Amino acid sequence: MAPRLQLEKAAWRWAETVRPEEVSQEHIETAYRIWLEPCIRGVCRRNCKGNPNCLVGIGEHIWLGEIDENSFHNIDDPNCERRKKNSFVGLTNLGATCYVNTFLQVWFLNLELRQALYLCPSTCSDYMLGDGIQEEKDYEPQTICEHLQYLFALLQNSNRRYIDPSGFVKALGLDTGQQQDAQEFSKLFMSLLEDTLSKQKNPDVRNIVQQQFCGEYAYVTVCNQCGRESKLLSKFYELELNIQGHKQLTDCISEFLKEEKLEGDNRYFCENCQSKQNATRKIRLLSLPCTLNLQLMRFVFDRQTGHKKKLNTYIGFSEILDMEPYVEHKGGSYVYELSAVLIHRGVSAYSGHYIAHVKDPQSGEWYKFNDEDIEKMEGKKLQLGIEEDLAEPSKSQTRKPKCGKGTHCSRNAYMLVYRLQTQEKPNTTVQVPAFLQELVDRDNSKFEEWCIEMAEMRKQSVDKGKAKHEEVKELYQRLPAGAEPYEFVSLEWLQKWLDESTPTKPIDNHACLCSHDKLHPDKISIMKRISEYAADIFYSRYGGGPRLTVKALCKECVVERCRILRLKNQLNEDYKTVNNLLKAAVKGSDGFWVGKSSLRSWRQLALEQLDEQDGDAEQSNGKMNGSTLNKDESKEERKEEEELNFNEDILCPHGELCISENERRLVSKEAWSKLQQYFPKAPEFPSYKECCSQCKILEREGEENEALHKMIANEQKTSLPNLFQDKNRPCLSNWPEDTDVLYIVSQFFVEEWRKFVRKPTRCSPVSSVGNSALLCPHGGLMFTFASMTKEDSKLIALIWPSEWQMIQKLFVVDHVIKITRIEVGDVNPSETQYISEPKLCPECREGLLCQQQRDLREYTQATIYVHKVVDNKKVMKDSAPELNVSSSETEEDKEEAKPDGEKDPDFNQSNGGTKRQKISHQNYIAYQKQVIRRSMRHRKVRGEKALLVSANQTLKELKIQIMHAFSVAPFDQNLSIDGKILSDDCATLGTLGVIPESVILLKADEPIADYAAMDDVMQVCMPEEGFKGTGLLGH
C-alpha cells in the first residue's frame, strides 16, 4: 500500500478540477477512501493507517491458529509455591536479611536445639478454645523462644515452599534494609537465647545452649623465672580463627593455640616473684562442645583505609576434623564431622549475599539454602565449586588449590560448623507439639485455600480466553465489508478488542465526529470500515456509539475542504505572481506600504487563515499539496510575528504609520490588490500617507536629549580626562609629594560616571556624588588609612584637589571626604600623620569588621573551587611555598606534567578542538589572587570544579561531594588550602577557614585495586552502629 501522504493526496486529487458546487456522492466516497483495495495478510507487513479497508496488523496474529492455554492468564501455577516432597522449606529475604536466614536454617537442622525449644512453655494456650484455636484471632508469639518455636514448626511441617520470618526479625528490631555483620549476629543471638532459656525450669531446655555450643579453654601463663603457672578459665561458643597468612584450617587452629612470649614492656607480673618477669602465655582447650563453631575472620579492620575489608584467602578444610591433638585431656572422643558451611558472596565487607550449605543430620545429604530457594546436592558430597566461581575476579587473586578426597577449600566461607561424631544415630523423631502443629495446620489450610482460589482464577481466565479466541476467529473473518453495507469503527478500539491484556470497553466514536455530528474526513486515517454484520455483534456485546453508517459521510465537510484546497492551489499561483511583482520598481505614487516582516510570511499567514476556516489547522502542518514552505522562515521569526496580523508590524503605538522606513517596503498597486484578497481587513497605507505626527514629535525630543547627553559627556570627559582614562591616579601607600590633601569618592560613582561618558545615548547621566555609602550612621568614616591601602581600596577612588574643584562644579556632592597629610615635629620632622575628615568611627568600624568575619564564617550555599593536582612535586610546592627556590619550573617538570594531565579524566576538556594552555600549579595560588583583583568573577581553570557548600558542614561531608565530582574516594583525598593541610574530618568548614570563593587543592592517592570498594564508600562513611537499638542488645 502507498504511504499515508500519497493516499491522502489521491483521495483529494479530484478537488483540483471539481468546483465545490459540483461535488457528488462519488467524490465524497473517494474522499473517505471507501473503495481502496483491502490489504492481504502476508503481503502487508503492518497496518496501513491511511486505508480504512486494511485490517491487517491490528493484533489479530495472536488469535489466528492454536493458542497455548497458559497465554490466557498471568497467574503462576500455585503448586509452584508448594513444598516438594522430602525437601526443606525456605525463608523469605526481607531486603538484606539473608544473613539471618542462613543461621536460622543451621539452627533448625540442629535436632537437639529444635527438640529443646519445642519443650518450652508457650502462651499459645491463651489462644486455645476447647480443642481448637480461635479462628478470629491470629497467633502472635510474645518471646524470642516462641518466635523460634513457631518458625521451626513451619520449617518442619509447612506445605509452603518458603515462609516469611518477618515476625522474628521484627521482634529483634532488625533493620531489614541494612546488611549486618553475620558473625556478630550469631554471637549476640546465642547470648540472648541462652539468657532467655536460663529462666526455664526444665534442665534439658535451660542448659541446651551450653550443652550444644559451649566449650571451655584456659589462658595459661608460665613465669620464666620461677615456673609458676596461672590459669584463667573462660567459656566459648565459637573459636575465632585468624586466616591471614594461612592456607589450612589446622594452621589457623595451631596459631590460635600458639604460645606467646611476654617480654619487654609486655612482661607479666608474677605474684610468686612479686615483680614483672618474662613469661609465656597460650590457650589450652579444656573441653569441646557437641557443635563446634569455627569463625573464620574474613572481615578485618584495615589500618590504611580505616575501614573493614574482606580477606579473599583460600582456606582448606576437611570433612573430618580430629581435635584430639589440640585438647589438654587426651583419650576422649574428639572427632568431628562437618555439618555446615556458611558462605559470603562478594568481594566487599559492606555488601554481598549470604548462603549456607547444611548437611541433613537424618539422611546425610547436603543442601544449599539460598533464602527462598533450596537446592539438594547430587550424591552425598559437599559441592562448593559453583559458589567459588561466583566471586568477582581480581588480578591479585591466587589460583584455587587442589583439594584431596574429603577436603574442600573456599575463599568465601566465613563459618564452619562441625558436629561431634557419635556411635548413636541422631534422633529422627523430633515431634512438633500439638499446639504448634495446630497452628501449622491452620496456616496450611490458608495456603490450600489460596491455592484453590488461584487455580479457580486460572481456570476462569482460561475459559474466558477460549471464548474470546472463538469470538475473534469467527468475527475477524467477517470484518471486511466489501460491497455490502458497512460502518466505521475506530482502529484504537479494534486493537484493544484484540488485546488480551486489557478489558474491552464500549465503542466510543465521539472523538471522530465533525461539527455536523458526522464522521470527520480527516479522522478516516484512524478509522476502519467493517461489515454491518460485525458491527451489529460488536454493539450488541459491548455497546457504545454513535454508529457511523454510510449516512455518516459528511458532504458539508467535503465541500468545504474542496473549497479550501482550491484556494490553496490559487494561493500557490498568487505567491509566484506577488514575488514577480515585488521584483519590479514602484513608479509614481501608486504604491502601498507593507511591513517587511509581513511580506516574508504572508503566505504562511494566509495558510493559517484557510486552516482556521477548515477547522483543523494541524492537518496542514505547514504543507500545501505536498509542497513545503520556504526554509528561510525560521522558527524564531515566526515566534515573534505569530501574534501580529498582516501589515500590523508597521503600526505605531498610536495606530498610525510608523516612522521607521527600515521596517516597511513600497509595493505596487497590483501586488497590494493580490495581498488584499487574502487580508481584506489589513491596515492600508498608500505611499502618500504621512507618518504618525506624535511619533515625529517624540523622535525630535529624543534626538535633542541624545545631543544634550553627548554634549554633557564630552564636557565632563574634557574636564576630567585622567579620571575617565584611569591615568595618573594618586596612591595612599605612595603619597604624592606635590599635595598634602586628597579627596575620596565612592568607586561606584566613578564606574557609573564612566559608563555614561562612554555611552551617553544609552546610559543616564550622573548628577550627584553619593559619599554617604562610605560613612556610618553617625557621620564617621568606616575605613582606616591602612584598610584603604589594602582590602578596602576597591571601594574608594582617590581624587586630586584640581579634580575635586571640577567635580564640585559638575555634580552635587552630599558629603566631602578628604585625607590630609601633616608633618609632626619642629626640627627635622621624622613622623607623618594622615588625618581624615570626617574622622574614623571606631565603634562602627569594629562592627563592620565583626560582620565581615561573621559573613565569612557563617554562610550557606556558597561557592568554593576544588582544583585537582596530578603531580606530587607540585602539590608540595603549593602546600609549602617557602620550599620553592625558583619561580619557574624546569623543562623536565614541564615534560612530566603533560602526560599526567592527559591521563587524568578531569583534565581532558576540549575547547573547540584546540588544547587549552595549562596553568602552572606552582603559580596557581598567585594566579587566583591576580584573577580576583582583575575581576570579581572567579575564572575556572582546567582540573577545577565548583561546589556549593555551607559553613556548618563537616570536612567529611565535603569529601563526599568531592568524591561525586572527581570519582576519588574520601580516604584517597589529600586536601589543602593556602598551604594548610585539611585533615580533621569532624571539623566544620567554617572552623577550618574555608570561606566563599576559596580554592582547595586536591591530591588523589593511587586508586585501590578493589574497584568495588567505591560502591561502598557511602556506606563506609556512615557511622557504623551495628546492632545498636535492636533486641539483641536488650533494647
From Swiss-Prot:
Positions of the USP domain: 89-421
Positions bearing Phosphoserine: S886, S887, S888
Annotated Polar residues bias: 618-629, 907-919
Subcellular localization: Cytoplasm; Nucleus; Cell projection, Cilium
Tissue specificity of this protein: Widely expressed. Expressed in the fetal inner ear.
Domain DUSP: residue ranges: 460-554, 569-691, 711-824
Effect recorded for C98S: Loss of deubiquitinase activity
Key words of the record: Acetylation, Cell projection, Cytoplasm, Deafness, Hydrolase, Non-syndromic deafness, Nucleus, Phosphoprotein, Protease, Repeat, Thiol protease, Ubl conjugation pathway
InterPro entries per UniProt: DUSP-like_sf, Papain-like_cys_pep_sf, Pept_C19_DUSP, Peptidase_C19, Peptidase_C19_UCH, Ubiquitin-like_dom, Ubiquitin-like_domsf, Ubl_USP48
Single GO molecular function: cysteine-type deubiquitinase activity
Annotated catalysed reactions: Thiol-dependent hydrolysis of ester, thioester, amide, peptide and isopeptide bonds formed by the C-terminal Gly of ubiquitin (a 76-residue protein attached to proteins as an intracellular targeting signal)
PTM sites of type N6-acetyllysine: K956
Biased composition (Basic and acidic residues): 895-906
Main location: cytoplasm
Record-level GO cellular component terms: cilium; cytosol; mitochondrion; nucleoplasm; nucleus
Disulfide topology: none
EC id: 3.4.19.12
A matching Pfam family: UCH
GO biological process per UniProt: protein deubiquitination; proteolysis; regulation of protein stability
UniProt-annotated catalytic positions: C98 (nucleophile), H353 (proton acceptor)
Region described as Disordered: spans on this chain: 612-640, 879-919
Family: Belongs to the peptidase C19 family.
Disease link: Deafness, autosomal dominant, 85: A form of non-syndromic, sensorineural hearing loss. Sensorineural hearing loss results from damage to the neural receptors of the inner ear, the nerve pathways to the brain, or the area of the brain that receives sound information. DFNA85 is characterized by progressive hearing loss, with onset in childhood or young adulthood.
Function according to Swiss-Prot or TrEMBL: Deubiquitinase that recognizes and hydrolyzes the peptide bond at the C-terminal Gly of ubiquitin. Involved in the processing of polyubiquitin precursors as well as that of ubiquitinated proteins. Plays a role in the regulation of NF-kappa-B activation by TNF receptor superfamily via its interactions with RELA and TRAF2. May also play a regulatory role at postsynaptic sites. Plays an important role in cell cycle progression by deubiquitinating Aurora B/AURKB and thereby extending its stability.
Subunit details: Interacts with TRAF2 and RELA. Interacts with GPS1.
Identification of the protein by name: Ubiquitin carboxyl-terminal hydrolase 48
Organism: Homo sapiens
Biological classification of the source: Eukaryota, Metazoa, Chordata, Craniata, Vertebrata
